[in-house]
Design a protein with these regions (language model features):
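Short, well-ordered secondary-structure micro-motifs
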Residues: 37, 59-63, 113
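Solvent-exposed helix-coil-helix hairpins and adjacent flexible coil/strand "hinge" segments
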Residues: 40-55, 69, 94-109
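Extracytoplasmic substrate-binding proteins
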Residues: 1-55, 77-82, 127-162
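Short, glycine/charged-enriched secondary-structure capping and boundary segments
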Residues: 10-11, 62-66, 115-118, 144-146
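Acidic/His-rich segments in extracytoplasmic proteins that coordinate ligands and/or metal ions
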Residues: 1-15, 87-125, 131
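Flexible, active-site-adjacent loop/turn segments at secondary-structure boundaries
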Residues: 56-59, 83-86, 110, 116-122, ...
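Alpha-helical, coiled-coil/dimerization segments enriched in small aliphatic residues
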Residues: 59-86
């Protein structure tokens, strides 16, 4: 989670005799996150299905995951209510009413678009299958704010038309 990320950055700073720099990194992350949260706080929440793999079943980021925390932070509803990394059958996936489907792996987008079973899904029909950077959205570290921002821009692009 975010707190563990901050703690890890400070622990590394402590171990490398660079605690002031580590604290500055955390301050910068928190400042960027605060700005992002302010951008999305009054927006109508969208729902997301965050796909992390499509073979042989559809795997997704569930409750309590780092990705789920990013979604919650951004006023985004995670369509997945199960904890951890549950798998979904095609039938259960189709039943999803997600506004947006995110993934970190480009071939997954092509696989989802190519499967006629998924053609009726809201996110597929509205072409809301979006690739986000896997390094920043699935790995905890000093690029936390970049990952959160990439999700925010993918789900709420209208807020970033500057």
């Amino acid at each position: 989670n975010f707190e563990e990320t901050y703690e890890t950055i400070e622990q590394i700073g402590l171990l490398t005799n660079r605690l002031p720099e580590a604290k500055k990194i955390n301050e910068d992350i928190q400042m960027k996150l605060e700005k992002l949260q302010q951008k999305v706080e009054n927006v109508e929440p969208k729902s997301v299905f965050f796909v992390v793999g499509v073979q042989p079943e559809i795997y997704t980021a569930g409750k309590g995951t780092y990705m789920d925390e990013m979604l919650s932070f951004l006023n985004i509803k995670n369509e997945v209510t199960e904890p951890d990394w549950p798998s979904y059958s095609a039938e259960d996936f189709i039943a999803s009413e997600a506004d947006v489907i995110l993934t970190t792996y480009e071939p997954d987008i092509e696989a989802l678009k190519a499967n006629p079973l998924f053609a009726t899904m809201k996110a597929v029909q509205s072409n809301q299958l979006i690739l986000v950077d896997g390094d920043t959205t699935s790995r905890q570290g000093p690029r936390l704010a970049e990952g959160v921002e990439s999700i925010a821009k993918a789900v709420y692009p209208e807020l970033f038309n500057e």
